[in-house]
Design a protein with these regions (language model features):
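Conserved AMP-binding/adenylate-forming core of the ANL superfamily
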Residues: 11, 20, 28-73, 77, ...
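Conserved AMP-binding A3 loop
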Residues: 40-42, 166-193
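Structural core segment of the AMP-binding/adenylate-forming
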Residues: 53, 57-58, 85-149
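ATP-dependent adenylate-forming carboxylate-activation enzymes
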Residues: 70, 91-104, 118-123, 231-252, ...
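AMP-binding/adenylate-forming catalytic core of the ANL superfamily
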Residues: 97, 114-116, 258, 352, ...
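Conserved AMP-binding/adenylation subdomain of ANL enzymes
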Residues: 189-207, 217-256, 271
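Gly/Ser/Thr-rich phosphate-binding loop
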Residues: 255-259, 269-332, 345
Length: 523
């Protein structure tokens, strides 16, 4: 029996357009899987239309901002897609933020509607006291279901311009307030099509991204490809990361692609009995968002021999992936973040925007249809980011003779000691390879002789038997030039992190009375 294709309200360049097409072509195929349940494409498309109409009935229109404060769930995805279908701008909110921080996102974005998880109701209520512009609230696990059930399922007749904003993704600021990166419909779809073409995804790819909450760009970008290809996005419930539960999910749902940050992969490969599990469904295993040691990458390759190990590099402002390392290159060029993805131009430049010689360190700048339109309401920051017609990443890299890129550090996270530049990532990578080190952060502290001196803050693998400063010093002496050696070592139980999991070097500098005023990576 033929199934009528639902009305497509955009120009083919929105996520909601693609959802409607798949609802017509494969209505009974799973679009979402979550906690043992799911939504077919027909069910998801109808619920998205109903929710879009429910928001419209409450005064939300094209260009209005709809904030979403929710734990991972199918309803969060439905709200994202409903906002897109309506032509509104979706504002994902980090569910780990306190009320004051949530209020800032609501007021800075100018949100008029808020869809909030019932579990986060107290935070939302306090935040709304500081955000009077929010006049519409729907609660996941509460009146949202009533609103969806009461709304019409008739297709919306709204044309959405693909060059208009789809999402405002707030970077997780570690100094000062976060900035909202404005991503258009075109930004996101070009990213999806570039990624799936580059990696060879297929409609039967089932993807789990437990390492990336849905408020994070990696959660959004990780879920869009299967939905736009007619595949299935498998969602893991929010909460503390459980490597055993993650492997259970892969086996149960036959996940083919999965993304985790390095610390999570380290926990996964250490699960007892992992070799006895049926993980044959995995086709691609990816990491990103933080540096991974070469030791961990080799372990991943050995643990999942049937899967392609992929290094994904980028940032929120770029939708987010700009460079990929895959296949045999994961071994041949281990330590690299790869080469530019399809539809991404890169240069490696100095402060005067001159291309640096091959092998020299410079800032990587981008030009791409995937790069954000602007920082929301911040024209000066936008102009600075796009100086010279290229987007300035703030990442310092070098490029080898084959065009492969290697991240050296963040541009503003560098220690200058005795006139020599010490790139923190290089020293951290060496120390992270020590068998007694779980994680490490390098910071600069004031030094009467050299101006700044490197200090390594180390979290040991075994707190009961941490490595000594003498052992760590000997390790570095064998692997680093002398000026790069940490002058001091501080042993701690764990490194402080922001809500997105990035190490808070500002907190470490404050604790150790460091003199550096640099900012932490925002994404």
């Amino acid at each position: 029996m033929s199934v009528p294709i639902p009305h497509v309200q955009g120009r083919g360049m929105t996520a909601a357009d693609q959802l409607a097409r798949w609802a017509g072509r494969t209505p009974d195929a799973w679009a979402l899987r979550f906690d043992g349940g799911g939504r077919t494409y027909a069910e998801l498309d109808e619920r998205v239309t109903r929710l879009a109409r429910a928001l419209a009935d409450r005064g939300v229109g094209t260009g209005d901002r709809v904030a979403v404060l929710g734990l991972n769930s199918m309803e969060v995805w439905e709200t994202y897609l409903a906002g897109v279908r309506l032509g509104a701008i979706v504002v994902p909110v980090n569910f780990r933020l306190v009320a004051d921080e949530v209020a800032y996102v609501l007021t800075d974005s100018g949100a008029t509607a808020l869809v909030v998880d019932a579990a986060l109701g107290e935070v939302a209520t306090k935040a709304r006291e500081q955000a009077p512009g929010v006049t519409t609230v729907l609660t996941i696990g509460g009146d949202l279901e009533e609103a969806v059930a009461a709304a019409s399922a008739e297709a919306l007749e709204i044309e959405v311009d693909e060059d208009e904003p789809a999402f405002i993704m707030y970077t997780s600021g570690t100094t000062g307030r976060p900035k909202g990166a404005v991503l258009t419909h075109r930004n996101l779809l070009v990213h999806v099509f570039s990624q799936v073409t580059h990696l060879g995804w297929a409609p039967d790819d089932r993807v789990g991204v437990p390492g990336a909450p849905l408020f994070h760009i990696a959660g959004l970008a990780g879920g869009l490809p299967p939905l736009l290809l007619g595949g299935t996005h498998v969602i893991l419930r929010s909460g503390g990361f459980d490597p055993v539960a993650t492997l259970d999910l892969v086996e149960r749902e036959r996940v083919s692609n999965i993304f985790l940050v390095p610390a999570m992969w380290a926990a996964v490969v250490a699960v007892p009995g992992i070799a006895d599990r049926d993980l044959s469904s995995l086709r691609r295993i990816s990491w990103g968002a933080a540096p991974a040691s070469t030791t961990l990458l080799r372990t991943m390759i050995d643990t999942f021999p049937q899967a392609e190990v992929i290094t994904a590099f980028g940032q929120t402002e770029c939708s987010p992936v700009t460079c990929l390392l895959r296949g045999e290159d994961s071994i041949r060029k281990i330590g690299s973040v790869g080469t530019p993805m399809l539809n991404v131009e890169v240069r490696v430049v100095d402060d005067a925007m001159r291309d640096v010689p091959q092998g020299d360190v410079g800032e990587i700048v981008y030009r791409s249809p995937m790069v954000m339109r602007e920082y929301w309401g911040k024209p000066e920051a936008t102009a600075e980011a796009f100086a010279g017609g290229w987007f300035h990443s703030g990442d310092l890299v070098r490029q080898d003779e084959d065009g492969y890129l290697y991240v050296v550090d963040r541009k503003k996270d560098m220690i200058i000691t005795g006139g020599e530049n010490v790139y923190c990532a290089e020293v951290e990578d060496v120390l992270a390879a020590h068998p007694g080190v779980a994680e490490v952060a390098l910071i600069g502290v004031p030094d009467a002789r050299y101006g700044e001196a490197p200090l390594a803050v180390v979290a040991p693998r075994d707190p009961a038997s941490p490595p000594t400063p003498e052992e760590l010093g000997a390790w570095c002496r064998e692997r680093l030039a002398r000026y790069k050696h940490p002058r001091e070592y501080s042993i701690v139980q764990a490194l402080p992190r922001n809500p997105s999991g990035k190490v808070l070097k500002t907190a470490l500098r404050a604790e150790h009375r460091a003199g550096s005023l640099v900012s932490d990576p925002a994404v």
